[in-house]
Amino acid sequence: MYAVFQSGGKQHRVAEGHTVRLEKIEVATGETIEFDQVLLVADGENVKVGAPLVAGGKVVATVVAHGRGEKVTIQKFRRRKHHEKKMGHRQWFTEVKITAINA
């Protein structure tokens, strides 16, 4: 059984037991969180596609950790002007483990 749900403006395909990195969510580590924006639920031959959401669909997950991703380096450069600017960015994420998919 798998589901596609939406969180943080992105869609994620998950199954029970999967670990997924999502955009940062303000929930303490170890707590349970429910995602109700389920777009699709599939169980073998049975596939429920929402229009736009599956009625009564829920994905239940436990927060495993919070952290920051790899650094992305940004460099701005203006030719012939001795101007160079270098910046970095690390995006916050929340790692969750999927415990149940309800349809």
Swiss-Prot record:
GO terms for cellular component: cytoplasm; ribonucleoprotein complex; ribosome. Coiled coil: none annotated. Keywords: Ribonucleoprotein, Ribosomal protein, RNA-binding, rRNA-binding. InterPro entries: bL21-like, bL21-like_sf, Ribosomal_bL21, Ribosomal_bL21_CS. GO terms for biological process: translation. One of its GO terms (molecular function) is structural constituent of ribosome. Pfam families: Ribosomal_L21p. Part of the 50S ribosomal subunit. Contacts protein L20. This protein binds to 23S rRNA in the presence of protein L20. Belongs to the bacterial ribosomal protein bL21 family. This is Large ribosomal subunit protein bL21. The lineage of its organism: Bacteria, Pseudomonadati, Pseudomonadota, Gammaproteobacteria, Alteromonadales.
